[in-house]
């Protein structure tokens, strides 16, 4: 239909090569709604008659329930929809639908509408997952576990503290995506192919109809720039990387060697040959799919970095990367929420491992600091105690007075003071005395949980307001269309 300048049609193999009709299934609805807003604006600006608008809008409305044939011969969904409108409304009316519009502003409109909906879905899923983390944390405020650095036991901690850490990380993912929405929710419609149009359209009118906050003003920028796509996929890549980190922890902790947690059967797979196996395949796939999302980002950046200003057909290729990114992240968040809420925590094993380790070493050093001894001296003493415990194959709490005396050699510290401090410290007392803001201390858990629940509520309120604004605009658009048809 678009080949008026060219004499011959594309061969079947060439058409298959250039066609994006399969990828365009994800934006069909947005293309129809965007076209309806454009036609309504053309009528309001007296560019087309009410009779023409009625025929076009009725045809577009009927297409919302249509099942499209990917073997139609159209290069993309835009051509297919216009061809169907012309077939139903006639060329004299349907042929006016594309007035003052190009596929260049049309496709980027569809992509922006699709991504903004995906962001709202992901943000809702994020809040559900964050809420699940906080909910599980609330039930494990006294569940003792070792905390790790370099995958080596570092300090005694609480499982709630671990879960809240990831709740905070995902909250930042929410905030990043929430902010990205503001830059995506700008309408490119009316920018034309690249330099605008001589026809008296109203770009702000269509932007308002479709729930956009504003327009992408510069027509070159509006049609050719895909920085908003790169930003969106980048934000989701960070989100998936954060989920992958949780997945890695849970894969390790669900092993027989750790036995800290057990995943529900619905999130594991058996071996094809070893009947005793319970493999964390879902978590492993999360790591793998994170790589896929990062690959999508790389594909997008690699595509756009080589383009001159103005639209290039290369940009057609990034759509599948966008859809894949959205699908993977939404599925991952839905799975993680359910997985967290069905997680079995082996509290006894966590505590046993914590108490059998020398995780009170830093507490000993800090107690000595409170006696006025320089930290570097106390660090040396605690390190010596740990080494002696390791060599004698017993915990620090079981060291003899003779051992302790060796640990303070070359210092002026009284070994009796060290013995007294060791005798007073347990894992539980350590956590009770942990007072720093945001620490693993018992008191901090209650405060942080309360604070996070409030933040989740505030986030939901803001998100609902944003969704309602878009829905209200689209409902108003539908009413205006219904008045005409």
Curated annotation (Swiss-Prot):
Keywords recorded for this protein, A-Z: Amino-acid biosynthesis, Arginine biosynthesis, Cytoplasm, Lyase
A Pfam family of this chain: ASL_C2
UniProt GO BP: arginine biosynthetic process via ornithine; L-arginine biosynthetic process
Domain of life: Archaea
A Gene Ontology term for the protein's cellular component: cytosol
Disulphides: none
GO-annotated molecular function: argininosuccinate lyase activity
Broad class of where this protein is predominantly found: cytoplasm
EC nos: 4.3.2.1
Location within or outside the cell: Cytoplasm
GTP-binding listed as a keyword: no
Top EC class for this record: lyase
Pathway annotation: Amino-acid biosynthesis; L-arginine biosynthesis; L-arginine from L-ornithine and carbamoyl phosphate: step 3/3
Catalysed reaction, written as an equation: 2-(N(omega)-L-arginino)succinate = fumarate + L-arginine
Signal sequence, renumbered to the chain: none
Family that this chain belongs to: Belongs to the lyase 1 family. Argininosuccinate lyase subfamily.
PANTHER family (alphabetical): ARGININOSUCCINATE LYASE
Protein name stated in the entry: Argininosuccinate lyase
Species annotation: Nitrosopumilus maritimus (strain SCM1)
């Amino acid at each position: 239909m678009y080949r008026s300048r060219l004499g011959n049609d594309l061969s079947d193999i060439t058409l298959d090569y250039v066609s994006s009709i399969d990828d365009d299934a994800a934006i069909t609805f947005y293309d129809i709604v965007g076209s309806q807003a454009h036609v309504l604006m053309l009528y309001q600006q007296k560019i087309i008659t009410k009779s023409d608008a009625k025929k076009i809008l009725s045809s577009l409305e009927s297409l919302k329930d249509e099942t499209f044939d990917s073997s139609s011969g159209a290069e993309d969904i835009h051509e297919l929809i216009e061809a169907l409108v012309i077939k139903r409304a006639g060329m004299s009316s349907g042929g006016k639908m594309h007035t003052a519009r190009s596929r260049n502003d049309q496709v980027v409109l569809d992509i922006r509408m699709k991504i903004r909906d995906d962001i709202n879905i992901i943000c809702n899923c994020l809040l559900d997952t964050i809420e699940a983390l906080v909910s599980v944390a609330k039930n494990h405020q006294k569940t003792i576990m070792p905390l790790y650095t370099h995958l080596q036991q570092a300090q005694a901690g609480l499982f709630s503290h671990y879960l809240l850490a990831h709740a905070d990380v995902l909250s930042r993912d929410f905030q990043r995506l929430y902010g990205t929405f503001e830059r995506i929710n700008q309408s490119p419609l009316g920018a034309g192919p690249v330099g605008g149009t001589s026809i008296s359209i109203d770009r702000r009118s269509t932007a308002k109809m479709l729930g956009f906050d504003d327009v992408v003003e510069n027509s070159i920028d509006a049609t050719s720039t895909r920085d908003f796509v790169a930003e969106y996929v980048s934000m989701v890549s960070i989100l998936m990387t954060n989920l992958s980190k949780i997945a890695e922890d849970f894969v390790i902790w669900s092993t027989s060697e750790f036995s800290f947690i057990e995943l529900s059967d619905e999130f594991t797979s058996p071996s094809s040959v070893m009947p005793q196996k319970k493999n964390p395949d879902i978590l492993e796939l999360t790591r793998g799919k994170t790589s896929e999302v990062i690959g999508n980002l790389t594909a997008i950046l690699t595509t756009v970095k080589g383009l001159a200003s103005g639209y290039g057909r290369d940009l057609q290729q990034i759509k599948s990367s966008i859809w894949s990114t959205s699908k993977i992240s939404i599925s991952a968040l839905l799975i993680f929420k359910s997985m967290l809420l069905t997680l079995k925590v082996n509290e006894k094993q966590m505590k046993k491992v914590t108490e059998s380790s020398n995780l009170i070493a830093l507490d000993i050093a800090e107690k000595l600091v409170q006696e006025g001894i320089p930290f570097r001296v106390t660090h040396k003493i605690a390190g010596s105690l740990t080494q002696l415990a390791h060599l004698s194959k017993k915990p620090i709490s079981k060291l003899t007075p003779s051992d302790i005396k060796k640990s303070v050699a070359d210092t002026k510290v009284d070994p009796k003071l060290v013995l007294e401090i060791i005798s007073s410290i347990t894992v539980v007392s350590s956590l009770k005395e942990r007072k720093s803001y945001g620490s693993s201390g018992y008191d901090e858990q209650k405060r942080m949980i309360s604070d996070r629940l409030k933040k989740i509520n505030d986030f939901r309120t803001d998100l609902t307001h944003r969704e309602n604004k878009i829905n209200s605009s689209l409902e108003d658009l539908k009413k205006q269309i219904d008045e005409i048809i």
